[in-house]
Amino acid sequence: MAKEKPILNVAFIGHVDAGKSTTVGRLLLDGGAIDPQLIVRLRKEAEEKGKAGFEFAYVMDGLKEERERGVTIDVAHKKFPTAKYEVTIVDCPGHRDFIKNMITGASQADAAILVVNVDDAKSGIQPQTREHVFLSRTLGISQLAVAINKMDTVNFSEADYNEMKKMLGDQLLKMVGFNPDNITFVPVASLHGDNVFKKSDKTPWYNGPTLAEVIDAFQPPEKPTTLPLRLPIQDVYSITGVGTVPVGRVETGIIRPGDKVIFEPAGAVGEIKTVEMHHEQLPSAEPGDNIGFNVRGVGKKDIKRGDVLGHTTNPPTVAADFTAQIVVLQHPSVMTVGYTPVFHAHTAQIACTFMELQKKLNPATGEVLEENPDFLKAGDAAIVKLMPTKPLVIESVKEIPQLGRFAIRDMGMTVAAGMAIQVTAKNK
């Protein structure tokens, strides 16, 4: 059997009207991942509902409710092959109320494609676009490319393309720490397929790669197999005749049958009996693998979602308190000492209290603007000291970046995102 192509997870980010789902649908179709008959059927359905042109988007928007609203809600995963990779697309939602999904979606991505509407050069960069790029950066995505879409609406004008490209570079990418010179921009018309998989004859002034070629130029992720084992628990099942079976995704390290393990903050200790993926037993599992495993000596009631598994020789860190760098995305008022919103870190959701506001930073450069500010508001970046109200596993991003990032939610929205830069471990 031929060696399978490496998998690359690519997040598609950007404003809801930029044509992300259509871009993704076009990649899937031209990449041979969709039966063309399906597109014909969806086109008919789209026309009947008065949404002609939405047929590619329908491929990603599998949920019926989304189809009627024309909005992508859950994070949809679809695959297509390029010359080099088996690409898994993480189609991140665009609407504000789905930013939480964006956070859980983007953190699984190795690279991101920002899709923008060329017409935004006239109206300015959409706030959502800023937020998505900023979040992607905060969540550790360092590889980014930009698809400037809907080029057909400006007659494939090079001037409009260059104006949009300059605006994105000056007003967005530089601000969040991406160097525009290292980012590939592609003029596309996803609805018609121009420069997505196939070179377009309508952009003779553009001699760069197609979007599919840009994806092939991304670097594959290095699996963090040498870091300590960390596996956040998503669910715990009790299976008759087998016993307790926790499931989750290996974030770092390697897990094997026979390993002595500990779940934190639960403190439950056991031994791995078997490791399974897709109903097959494995001799070991590594980062990125979604697995179920059977543990000797641990009952279903001993552990829960949000616990993190590690080896007994290097247990996950339970934080007494931690210092973090955060970015306030949106907040109706201000954040002060004593504020206690819910932190979403890996699979855990725990309220944490702001103990100290140590420094306010320039979000674009990281330089200190103010020591010990009285409050933080939307748009601020800061260094803060936090204390979990219940036991929480979190690691410093310097040591185990996969377990150092978090989102802060309050009032039904994501108010901030950040990363732990120093963690004080709880004494046992």
UniProtKB/Swiss-Prot annotation:
Q: Which SUPFAM superfamilies match?
A: EF-Tu/eEF-1alpha/eIF2-gamma C-terminal domain, P-loop containing nucleoside triphosphate hydrolases, Translation proteins
Task: Kindly provide the name given to this protein in its UniProt entry.
Answer: Elongation factor 1-alpha
- Outline the segment boundaries, as ranges, of region: G2: 70-74
Q: Establish whether keyword Protein biosynthesis is in the entry.
A: yes
As its record notes, the protein acts as a catalyst of:
GTP + H2O = GDP + phosphate + H(+)
**Similarity section:** Belongs to the TRAFAC class translation factor GTPase superfamily. Classic translation factor GTPase family. EF-Tu/EF-1A subfamily.
Q: Where is this protein primarily located?
A: cytoplasm
**GO CC term, one of those recorded:** cytoplasm
Q: Which InterPro entries match?
A: EFTu-like_2, EFTU-type, G_TR_CS, GTP-eEF1A_C, P-loop_NTPase, Small_GTP-bd, T_Tr_GTP-bd_dom, TRAFAC_GTPase_members
Q: What does this protein do?
A: GTP hydrolase that promotes the GTP-dependent binding of aminoacyl-tRNA to the A-site of ribosomes during protein biosynthesis.
Asked whether the UniProt record includes NAD among its keywords, one would answer no
Task: For the region G1, give the residue spans.
Answer: 14-21
**CDD domains in UniProt:** EF1_alpha, EF1_alpha_II, EF1_alpha_III
UniProt domain tr-type G: residue ranges: 5-225
Instruction: Give me the ranges of the annotated region G3.
Output: 91-94
Listed A to Z, the keywords are: Cytoplasm, Elongation factor, GTP-binding, Hydrolase, Magnesium, Metal-binding, Nucleotide-binding, Protein biosynthesis
Q: Which GO terms describe its molecular function?
A: GTP binding; GTPase activity; translation elongation factor activity
User: Any idea where this protein resides?
Assistant: Cytoplasm
